[in-house]
A protein has these predicted regions:
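Sequence/structural signature of beta-propeller domains
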Residues: 1-164
Length: 164
């Protein structure tokens, strides 16, 4: 990850592996979970696998990872936000957010299966910071909660149903 700013925005766990999501350059870092825990105690860096995902642009700014959770063993539901800035740390004008699904069955070639913009409901653009699954009612219907941040200290929890 040379020449990449480090800004871990999300983590997810599945099948003995920890996945960290870097907002800058939309990189996913994969560790064996037990090796990662050992690293925290010993400082011995474990084997790292890295993949980069291309996410859509809104108004010429690429979306950046903001949240992630596993739906199934190889499917990650992710959120990404778009701000008018090229800086991985400092906030810019909020342009919008999206939700999507990534298939990581081949971690070296992960694929964004689908994504949708998250509607603003006539308000200012929403910046979604994370997502978690409340329940899976069926294979096609998943209830989630988003947490938003307007960069002014205000947050909201928003429940939504995703048709997968």
């Amino acid at each position: 990850m040379a020449n990449t700013e480090l800004n871990i925005e999300a983590s997810a766990f599945s099948d003995g592996f920890l996945y960290l999501f870097n907002r800058s350059n939309n990189v996913i870092v994969k560790f064996d979970y037990q090796d990662f825990l050992s690293y925290l105690k010993t400082g011995n860096l474990p084997k790292i696998e890295i993949s980069r995902i291309s996410l859509p642009e809104i108004e010429k700014f690429e979306a950046g990872f903001s949240g992630a959770t596993f739906k199934e063993k190889s499917q990650i539901i992710f959120t990404a936000s778009v701000e008018a800035t090229d800086d991985a740390y400092n906030d810019g004008e909020i342009i919008g957010s999206l939700i999507g699904v990534i298939n990581i069955s081949d971690f070296q070639k992960p694929k964004v299966i689908r994504y949708n913009l998250i509607p603003n409901n006539g308000e200012n653009p929403i910046k979604v910071e994370s997502v978690t699954i409340l329940s899976s009612k069926s294979n096609d219907n998943t209830e989630v909660v988003f947490i938003t941040d307007d960069d002014n200290g205000n947050t909201k929890l928003i429940k939504a149903n995703l048709k997968m």
